[in-house]
């Protein structure tokens, strides 16, 4: 899908501002400069009062790996067992689109038996998901692995980062 971190922020702003003709440069985040890479890009952070935004690293991690029963799991399907990289029709309840199992993106929710303990879908595999974490000064956090990466990238122990212009 090749969505940059800044594209994701602009989409969040658009949603935050009610869609339609809503502004993409202010809202949940203030993006300065009017260019694809904002002049404040390395330091842009969530504005107070935002109602639609990217998650922080901690918010993403909890939604994917935490059980309301007080346990953290290794994989975002509510299990410590290694996730199976399979096509959606072979979903066993611990499955994802990873390791070239499908060789393409799948629809959101295609692995209907493989929700996290909070009921979220697709936090493992399919596409990398940006979060707000700043890593190494100029990169931003991302989680979840993708359809082209091995199952290890889905694990709680595998945080990742990438250039925000990605």
Q: Which residues does each PLM region occupy?
A:
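Extracytoplasmic Gram-positive cell-surface binding/anchoring modules and repeats
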Residues: 1-2
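Functional-site microenvironments in short loops/helix caps that host divalent-cation chemistry
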Residues: 5-155
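Short, P/G- and charge-enriched loop/turn segments at secondary-structure junctions
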Residues: 156-163
């Amino acid at each position: 899908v090749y969505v940059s971190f800044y594209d994701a922020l602009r989409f969040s702003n658009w949603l935050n501002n009610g869609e339609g003709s809503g502004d993409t440069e202010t809202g949940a985040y203030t993006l300065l400069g009017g260019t694809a890479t904002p002049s404040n890009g390395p330091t842009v952070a969530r504005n107070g009062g935002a109602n639609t935004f990217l998650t922080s690293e901690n918010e993403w991690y909890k939604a994917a790996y935490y059980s309301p029963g007080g346990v953290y799991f290794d994989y975002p399907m509510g299990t410590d067992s290694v996730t199976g990289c399979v096509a959606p029709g072979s979903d066993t309840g611990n499955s994802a689109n990873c390791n070239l199992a499908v060789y393409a993106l799948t629809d959101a929710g295609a692995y209907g038996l493989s929700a996290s303990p909070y009921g979220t879908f697709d936090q493992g595999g399919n596409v990398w998901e940006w979060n707000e974490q700043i890593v190494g000064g100029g990169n931003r956090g991302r989680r979840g692995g993708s359809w082209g990466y091995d199952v290890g990238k889905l694990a709680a122990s595998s945080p990742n980062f990438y250039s925000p212009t990605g």
